[in-house]
Amino acid sequence: MQFLDDDPLIAKKDFGVQAALDAYFEELSGVLAALPREKIAAAVKICDETRRKNRTVYLCGNGGSAAAATHFAADLSKVAYVPGCARFRTCVLSDNTSTLTAYSNDESYDRAFRGQMEGLATRSDLLIGISTSGISASVVEAFAFA
């Protein structure tokens, strides 16, 4: 099997990888420096209060944001575990395709997450919505209920 870097024309070609990495890390450093640390700390406290009360963290998003919600839920329930403490209880509203498509088909996609919240969520549960635009109707509707 031949790999691309075995090709002498490709091996000699400078694709500007180092310059691209340098620019990426410089941009990333700026983004990290600009993060609102106080707001992040407040969000972590809210998540921890939800865990301590043995309440559920619901998450939702569309497209890549749905994948991010699933990944975050896995991190909360597995990685954020502290021995001797309760684990996070998580539910990703975009993961159950049967329920998601039933609400989408029978009502509207805009109500797909809200409909699930109406049947599942209780007082003191937490909803985390992920949206790159910030205006995804299905995510906004879930927050209107929460």
Task: Give the residues covered by each predicted segment.
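A short, well-structured juxtamembrane/interface segment
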Residues: 35-53
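A ubiquitous structural signal for well-ordered alpha-helices
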Residues: 24-27, 31, 43-46, 72, ...
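Glycine-rich phosphate/diphosphate-binding loops and the adjacent beta-loop-alpha structural elements
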Residues: 9-14, 55-62
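Short, structured helix-loop boundary elements
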Residues: 18, 37-40, 110
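N-terminal, charged amphipathic alpha-helical interaction modules
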Residues: 40, 64-65
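Generic N-terminal amphipathic, Lys/Arg-enriched alpha-helix
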Residues: 1-34
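Glycine-rich phosphate-binding loops that contact phosphosugars or nucleotide phosphates
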Residues: 58, 65-146
